Amino acid sequence: MTYNDVLARELSTDVRVLIRDYFKSREDEQQFPRELLYQFIERFDIFSLLLDSQDSVLRTEFLTFIRLISKDFPAFSAVLLTQACYGIYPILRYGSQEQKASYVEPLVRGEILAGLGFSEGKLMDSLEVIATTARKTETGWSLTGKKSIVSNCRYTDILLILAKVQEADGEDGYGVFIVDTIRPGVTFGDDIAKPGLQGLPVNSVTFDQVILPEDSLLGLTLNGETQLNDIIKKLQLGLSAISIGISEGAFEKGLAFVKVKRGFGKRLIDATVYQHQFADLYTKLCAAEAYFASCKDRMEEDSLFVSQIKLYTTKVAIEISEEIIRLIGPLQTLDDIPIDRYLKDAKTVEIYGKSGDSIRKRIAAQWIKE
């Protein structure tokens, strides 16, 4: 089960009121929604809903929240998902007892924010392309390198950074390191422009011989590849929920528009052509929902299946948003319905958590092997 209808109905009004009030006070669309984050934590304790008892599967309640919020403010859902999947989940799932004691509660309460750095601007067919290195020292580690894209970056207190480590036998190992962002040698780049998800800041970050304590290695073990693959899988599941929320938001706003009486007391939805077009969009949305709902049967043993769901749900979000714009775009000046924001957000989600093209390449690999 990936969606709780009862919970969604109970929370829908409160969620929309909080988001509406935030939009009224927001100075600009680039503003990081920190105040709204604190309100959601205080009102709903949202991050305590993250995991089930096995600490390995995103809970239905959390996915429901993410999807519900995305109907009105997808960028805020992405901020929450980043904190959850790039901060809380990795430490709770893989951290040592000391790491859990130091970070989990402050992360859940929103007292510290986290991000994850793994991309270096190259297609990651394997971890061999990673150039960021962690060198063992007498007292811990020295981290050097650059990550090209890190979400929530300049607002984070800690970053989880994937780095290459040369082991004693000369082989390369990979580990995830917990880095306090106030450490000397940590430098954030300028904000990276993107079409949508405004309010979710993305930056590069450079590490110049950053000195880390010995216990900064996540789980105190070089298990970076397994950890990263699991983290990305959880993120893609959350991004699928965001995509369905975007589809629902665009569809519902478009439907509300065509159900309003216009000139001569007529509604657009009274025309057969609009009825058929919205029926097609609704069918497409239902297909995406069904695909998403099937994920838990295969999620643990099949990461590619989760990637395929992410690919399809984002594609549907883009298509529904584009079609709604095409149907009501010429008339949209009559109503304040920012449908175009859904399209921009959907296109940005498509490249987050491994891009659509990288997923397509991975799917196609099974057919081109010798």
Each predicted region: which residue ranges?
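A structural signal for short hydrophobic beta-strand segments in well-ordered beta-sheet cores
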Residues: 132-135
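N-terminal glycine-rich flavin-associated loop
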Residues: 78-98, 124-127
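Amphipathic, small/basic residue-rich leader segments at the start of a protein or domain
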Residues: 1-82, 102, 109, 367-370
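FAD-binding glycine-rich core of flavoenzymes that anchor FAD
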Residues: 93-119, 138-139
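C-terminal helix-coil-helix/basic helical segment that borders enzyme active sites and/or dimer interfaces
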Residues: 20-31, 259-266, 282-315, 325-333
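Glycine-rich beta->alpha junctions and the first turn(s) of the following alpha-helix
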Residues: 2-6, 190-285, 349
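Glycine-rich phosphate/cofactor-binding loops in nucleotide/flavin-utilizing enzymes
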Residues: 8, 12, 328-370
